[in-house]
From Swiss-Prot:
Gene of this entry: srp54
Protein's UniProt name: Signal recognition particle 54 kDa protein
Quaternary state and interactors: Part of the signal recognition particle protein translocation system, which is composed of SRP and FtsY. Archaeal SRP consists of a 7S RNA molecule of 300 nucleotides and two protein subunits: SRP54 and SRP19.
Keywords for the protein's UniProt record, in alphabetical order: Cytoplasm, GTP-binding, Hydrolase, Nucleotide-binding, Ribonucleoprotein, RNA-binding, Signal recognition particle
Amino-acid positions noted as binding GTP in the UniProt annotation, renumbered to this chain: 106-113, 187-191, 245-248
Reactions catalysed: GTP + H2O = GDP + phosphate + H(+)
Domain notes per entry: Composed of three domains: the N-terminal N domain, which is responsible for interactions with the ribosome, the central G domain, which binds GTP, and the C-terminal M domain, which binds the RNA and the signal sequence of the RNC.
Enzyme class: hydrolase
Main localization (coarse): cytoplasm
Amino acid sequence: MLEGLSESLTQTMKKLAGMSIIDKKTLKDVTKDIQRALIQSDVNVKVVFGLTKKIEKRALEEELPKGLSPKEHVMRIVYQELVNLIGEKPEELKINRKPYKIMMLGLQGSGKTTTTAKLVKHLKKKGHTSAIVCTDTWRPAAYEQLRQLTEPLDVPVFGDPENKDAIDLAKKGLEKCGSKYDVILVDTAGRHKEEKDLLDEMAELSQIVQPDEVILVIDGTIGQQARSQAETFKKTTDIGSIIVSKLDGSAKGGGALSAVAEIRAPIKFIGTGERVDDFEAFDPERFISRLLGMGDLDTLIEKAAEVTSEKSDKEMIDSIISGKFTLKDMENQLEMMNKMGPIQQIMKLIPGLGNQLPANASKVTEEKLGMYKILMNSMTTYELENPEVIKKSRINRISRGAGLTNDDVKDLLKYYNVTKKALKGMGKRNMSGPMGKLMRHMQR
């Protein structure tokens, strides 16, 4: 998620942590690095310079807080101002009536339909029953896409691909849903902001649906253009909140987030990948903590809680955090990571690990995961608990037993060693020094 921006800001914080003195010159060096990183992420130039001016002013004029050194104080200011840049923490989506009606809006290509399915999954995790009313008459595949995405969730989709009257579809869909479901999501046709007829239809739909919440889905790859998009929709209907989609790997995601924050539209959720599970409630403090390489243990614990139930799973989470795990632990880890999301994203939640995990460590496809499981099934319990004993003769035996090659065994061992090495620095060492002190200070 925002890999380039995260890497740049993490390096800036490390540079700051390593400074022996903080004066106007060193402060200017730091703010120039921040300016470069944010502008490359398509954050508005005027906004960027305003932010770095605040950082410099506060760093030079504020009284040093008790218990913090000058550089720790500057790091704290950088963190706080970046949090302010992307807005306040929004209120949670409160389902306070039945049915609670949500109208989903967005431009064509924003990822609105997929995001609707993601929101349904999120609501299901919270214990709410949902149904979807599809009123998208412009894209023939919309109804079928929704049906396929939500079928595993056992969520009904009401619609009719043959009916080209969105208002009629909304009325009939709402009538069929009645009050059987906690939440009814109305998926609308993707708009172009210039298409007046569609915007008029959206306003009419809003009158028919009488939504409790109107959610606008904005594509995170469009950068600061998100501002004008949100403003156009806001003029047509009341926007209750915003979901920024496609933040995984987007070079302009920072620009999109800050642009939306400028017009004070609350960002409630963000989409962080292609899977239905790649979706999370937006929390500016947690988000910036991850961007700066400070981790986000709260989100890690929440994600783990969603996919773990047995004691052994919880013990394995401790292994991940401590960096002490065997091949058997790694087998369980990969299973859990596969449920929680891409390993690179999960590792960014662990304080101090941030960008340390090599890029190739995240490229564990389902196919490779299957191969690794076959290889581990060919190992003895002793080998799984003591991977260091696996040398040439054992490699030969394991590969033969699995029907795979020696290179496959070596690939597994290489992945294990890379991951173990990356996790070795976890624990107390990652919470030491200025960065660690700042993390502890932020957790108070």
